[in-house]
Amino acid sequence: MNWSRLREILDYETGILFGQTIEEIELAVMKYVSEYRDAVLVNNVMDEIRRTVTKPWTLMEICGGQTHAIVRYGIDQLLPPEIELVHGPGCPVCVTPLELIDKALIIASQPDVIFCSYGDMLRVPGSGRDLFSVKAAGGDVRIVYSPLDAVEIARENPEKQVVFFAIGFETTAPPNVMSVLQARSLGLTNYSILVSHVRVPPAINAILSSPTSRVQGFLLAGHVCAVMGYHEYPLLVDRYQIPMVVTGFEPLDIVQGILETVKLLEQGKVEISNPYARVVTYEGNIAAQEHIAQVFEECDRKWRGIGTIPMSGWQLKPEFDAFNAERKFDVGEIKAEESSLCIAGQILQGMNKPQGCPAFGTLCTPEHPLGATMVSSEGACAAYYRYGRVTINV
């Protein structure tokens, strides 16, 4: 086993294991991961859900990581028929707008650029191609596991412009912010980020304000709340009179989140609950929030397949324009249209499921995706395809 990689993963996931020994990490795995995949414990909670539910309820898990866990472990198939889970827009790759991907393709194609990105983004289709196509055509496109890796590449290649594709929700904002601060402290003028950061609370507001919304309760994204806390959500709970429950990503976390949501609904309680307290606090990570506020400011942001949601994104503050790839590489305005066959926007808003798409598994596959929900490791369509959850009509 790659222990250094495991340490990195656990540090990122829980935020509590920095500097621990291998033996301590092994114990932490047992405590924080293994028991939360225990089939007996999961079935016990499932039994309690069955005893509790008396009415039909529609719940939305907001995060793509939760969606994959639900489909992978068959959680939705074990639930009583009264409970329907619909999938939310919490997949950062899936909601990155087509126009910004096209800008990334233009920037990455320039001969003096090293374009760095997480691996998922390389296969997301733009209007006509993807970043893998740029790489195949000779562009210097590199997969990195951290924006700090991109900063190091910029330090080692002063003659090149290094651009990091900074996508994601609140969870990935702190390392992206730190990359900018580190580049500034190192005096690097050849590092910039192409920003497509989005925020969860405005997305939930947009979903619930739609007259077509069927969502009666939310499973909030635990990792987002680990960074930002959950102090922004009581306002939404009060406004729309629905319960919200902070939920983790392991099977036991998810069924506990479902149970807590169902209990609140059955009791007619409108409140927010946090059964994921081993990771999440009400305030969140204050230091991370302060760094985000130092570098980013809120802005309107377009979500792929959904449209523009007011104040749902972050952009670099003007004093950090030197690190703004959109300003450094003025590629102008780009207009792009989605495939008319792709219903990813409906899926991301919980209005449909992958099996409702006529292109699923035929015209749209992971090898030849029409939309980002079939590409991303957190996309709902990719989860359904990978785990064989849909009968394909041909």
Report the location of each language-model feature.
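Short beta-strand segments
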Residues: I62, H87, C116-G119, F164-I167, ...
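A conserved active-site cap/scaffold subdomain adjacent to cofactor or substrate pockets
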Residues: V215-A277
